[in-house]
Amino acid sequence: MTSFTPASVPDPHTGLPIGVEAGIHAAARPERITIDGRYVRLEPLDAIKHTDDLYVASHGDDKHVIWQYLFEPPFTDHADFKAHIERKAASDDPLFYAIIDKASGKAVGYETLMRIDPTHRVIEVGNIMYGTPLQKTPGATEAQYLLMRYVFETLGYRRYEWKCNSLNAPSRRAADRFGFTFEGIFRQHMMVRARNRDTAWYSILDTEWPKQKHAFEAWLDPRNFNSQGRQIKRLEDFK
């Protein structure tokens, strides 16, 4: 876990350390908007538009692993999955965005902004489902960049959180790669499908965003990929 010394100033009356002023203005709530990127587009989740594509991208004998650490197991049939997407699309918190692959025009995953706290300017990215066509592509990284940019630059949040099952090694590697700082483990934090879940907590702060933004944009630049579409430099190499 990264060591952290909180910024402080002395209280003028007691001399004891207190937090620095952060302002009392609230952040804005995320909206159902379209966020356009080079490789992917985020748009409000819609059961009519997105169910068929998402079902194909996330269901099949070779795709059970996609659901391993999510709250829901793989769905038994298309109708159940559509009802699931309808419920998610109607939610305001979490607020779901479909991830659209711009080359194919198909929905290949979804992600959310959740635990939305405009007063304290804290928000979380979660409920991330990447179908097999999205995994390990530039669009998978860009989908995260687009939400981060929206959160920090448009909505004005101070803290952006990532939480996952502590046993979910791929999610934890992704958090590290995307520039989140590991903050610790919440033991016996919740139960998922009647099993214990210890939760790993990560965050990016608004003061850290400019450096992370530079790294994302440099990595996503088409010049960072060869003619076979392979990266020339890793995202971590730009930090």
Predicted regions and their residues:
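Conserved beta-strand-loop-alpha-helix junction that forms the acyl-donor binding cleft
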Residues: 162-171
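Conserved catalytic-core motifs of GNAT/GCN5-like acyltransferases
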Residues: 181-195
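Conserved active-site tyrosine of GNAT-family acetyltransferases
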Residues: 174-175, 202
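Glycine-rich acyl-CoA binding loop
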Residues: 140
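Conserved GNAT acetyl-CoA-binding A-motif
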Residues: 153-163
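GNAT-family acyltransferases
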Residues: 2-137, 150, 195-200, 204-210, ...
